[in-house]
Amino acid sequence: MALQLLAAASLSYEVASIARQPRSPRAAVRAAAAATSFDLAAYMEEKRLLTESVLDASLSSTCPETDLIVESMRYSLMAGGKRVRPMLCYAATEMFGGSLEASSPTAVALEMIHTMSLIHDDLPAMDNDDFRRGKPTNHVLYGDDVAILAGDAMLSTAFEYVAKNTKGVPAERVVTVLAMLGQCVGPVGLAGGQVLDLKSEGKSDVGLDTLAWIHTHKTAALLKAAVATGAVLAGATDAEVAKCEEYALKIGLAFQVADDILDVTASTEELGKTAGKDLDADKTTYPKLMGLDKSKEYAAAAAQFARAILRTRAQISDGARSHPPGRYAKQLVTEAKECLADFGDRAAPLNGLADYIIQRKN
């Protein structure tokens, strides 16, 4: 089934001819925004179905002794979700003319790494959340001990899966991909970002620079790896990979800004996880810091936003997205699209996913 979906996806995605490039990156963004031929919803559904299929085939128990830990791993891995990271990997691969078969193992690994981070983030020692994607979190069902080990096993399985299943790609590219995946998890990746995030809770002297470092590493690093590995597998040049990484870092920050806004504007039912956790834990977030920012550009709206947050999340209106954090997210997405201006119509999926990141409801 997975191979059939891969073949169908490869045939259904046709690279459009590259039109004459506008004079400036901003003009390119405007031109891309005006185009209506690309169906993002259909693209995302196609890639979601492909991702679900390859994920389901990627993990199974090999003996009775491993049944429990594999059950725990599969519970979180197959619990649904947006599957944005695999989509970004596939989109980057296609942008450079690569095959979905070549990038599929890396797409699986990216989602495994993401799932590992969610299992660990939800633990009582960290974010202490009982719900994820509308379901009880892993540790609630299996206990803290099994959840920790399931996350650990998920991480190691991600690397094993890439090494064993990536076919038709030069070995040096696979090694580069493994190195990128390793870096995005480590001290300068999501683990380092999570540590600084935890240690910043309740502190009043955390500034925007620190917050940007946290989320560039905690959130954006894995998105960066998703786009960059997809490009590497397809044979992109170093310069092209660098542009992809810049794009991904910007959408990663935009993703986190949108997440912070949703935490104070959406309900638990809409989010599929406990709403208001950031405020309750006194986490440093973009709404909190931008609400207190004294810059001329944001002064009036920021003060209003800050006062609302400090009073209670229940009083924050649906208009919160029009305040500074929402504008910042849109600015980041515009800048991200500019990074891909040289790729013309081939960048339509990545540009569409950038828009989706700040328009999503959960």
Over which residues does each language-model region extend?
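All-alpha prenyltransferase/terpene-synthase fold signal
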Residues: 2-11, 20-362
